[in-house]
Amino acid sequence: MLDILTIHWNVDPVLLHLGPISLRWYSLLFVSGFIFGWYMVRSFYRREGVDERLLDPLLYAMLISVIVGARLGHCIFYDPQYYFGSWQGFLEVFQPWKGGLASHGGAIGIIIGLLWYTNKYGKKEGFDFFWLADRIVLVVCFAGACIRLGNFFNSEIIGYNTTLPWGIVFDRTGDPNPKHPTMLYEALTYLTMGVVMIWLYRKKLDKLYRGELFGIFLTFCFGMRGLLEFTKAPSVTVFTIGDVVINMGHLLSFPFAIAGIAFWIWSVKRGVPATIQRQPYRTPKKA
């Protein structure tokens, strides 16, 4: 009877085979996050009078920053001995399809990419790093949810054994025990945060300070990420406190959350309005 009630997950991670090319669910959801994000940022730019011609450079900067940052993050944080211990491993650093990506590295990459972009384009348009970061984190919430759904299709980022009714048997792993679907917990967290932060942006932006949404995002996103790590089977254990395992995810998440609290407080004390005070930008008419 219990086996009948157990949720099994055995979906092929490959959505479509096109000759030698395979389209994976993860890739589709990853790209969908960027496409959806582009349209979100376009709506922000239109609403606040920023030149839409700056959207494409932002897209390229984010694509490069996320992929490079996430790949280096995986190699440095999770398996440096392999990737930097031999030439074979080092060459695989440049082959992200062999190994993985790390979200904390992707976050660092996004920050670096935004610093470059705002330094190059922001002064002319009247915005700075924190103005743009306040809006990009809204995109990151929904893109992060898409990526975690991609992890679900890949049967990865799986938690410990559980007897809870929503525990899932991931048949493709070969383990018959129900597990915490940690990737779905994270997807739901990011989606909920995205809805709340869109509401703050749409309804309360005139009452917020520049950098405040960025601080709120770091605080709650990585705070929750750190807590959810306690349900996840660790890939790299850093140390233990009694029966409690502290893994690399904890070690990377909580500093981000603490930084978020600091940015949140600093933005309120600084008191710079979150908006750009000017007329909305009008897209040039075609001749």
Which residues does each PLM region occupy?
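A feature for loop-to-transmembrane-helix boundaries and adjacent hydrophobic helices
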Residues: 1-287
